């Protein structure tokens, strides 16, 4: 019974953790923002991509394969014909633009991808984005080579599928084969989500976490597509109100669902390391960052004294019993003041080392870093609108006891442990005499 209770408590804390992460990452709000951005950049993206197929006639068949695949699998059948007709019309008109106009379209497409990358960096708690030159090169490769490679792959898949259908035309297919053929798009969708989660954030993402997030997002995407298609077909509310214009609001709603599923899958992939090590339910409190930063510095100090090369983020998260997002936030702030440094080796996770002398690391500095920003507080107290005396308040915050160092705290803790061990040992040795 206790095991069941433990599992239920764990599931409850896990649900609270998921709700907290969703609130912190602002998944619904970011999905709405990306929906609006996508509507503005959809024509530029389609124009840049389809212009490549037009410039090289050899790729014309690949373009048809890509359009057919997107029409069948990207959105419900009730919307794809109208939406792709609109896109083709807009893209064909955009081909007559001048060079400046095409540059503007490309910039718009790049800005969309930058928005998506920024959203992923927020979800993975990454503060430092890629250099702008590297980002533009990656985006250009995705925009130009992506449609061609996908078109080639789909053309080959279409050919193989046609050959298999011809081979089995005279035979009666079993329901298992029919189900397998109908779900052939699911692995491609899962692979696309997985690659997106691995390479788009500016951090190292484990493939196993990205695969779980990608498969979850792909399944949710297929279910949403079928459910949304059923809603449009059976409950024609938008058609009755908007008439022929109904495709636009329905497409907006579908784009919002797509982005919500994409971001939710990213949130799952980013939260899996914390869930896997079990550090997702420790409560935070006012001043917990101060305590955790001291504990983190103490661990790095012990590692340096032992001759170790420091610890990685997962190792520190496990020691602090905190999620990786909180640990990364602490490390970044301590790295900014040059108390710690990261050691990056090829293909490995970075290790963090202690640079500062523990005898010079004071609680007062950490108090100002994680609890009260005294510089900002002093500025606010100088404003004419304040009703409290700034000098008295700042003087009250001046406490010599906050000048205690990390070395003193470590020494005091070691002495307390030694005294406790000696007391336990003396108590154990006196037990036989008392029994006698």
Curated annotation (Swiss-Prot):
Key words, A-Z: Cell inner membrane, Cell membrane, Membrane, Transmembrane, Transmembrane helix
Pfam name, any one: Virul_fac_BrkB
Location(s), subcellular: Cell inner membrane
Residues annotated as transmembrane: 42-62, 96-116, 136-156, 180-200, 210-230, 241-261
Membrane topology of this protein: Multi-pass membrane protein
GO cellular component, one term: plasma membrane
Top-rank lineage group of the source organism: Bacteria
UniProt cross-references to InterPro entries, sorted A to Z: UPF0761_bac, Virul_fac_BrkB
Family label: Belongs to the UPF0761 family.
Database matches in PANTHER family: INNER MEMBRANE PROTEIN YHJD (PTHR30213), UPF0761 MEMBRANE PROTEIN YIHY (PTHR30213:SF0)
Protein name: UPF0761 membrane protein Bxeno_A3061
Lineage of the organism: Bacteria, Pseudomonadati, Pseudomonadota, Betaproteobacteria, Burkholderiales
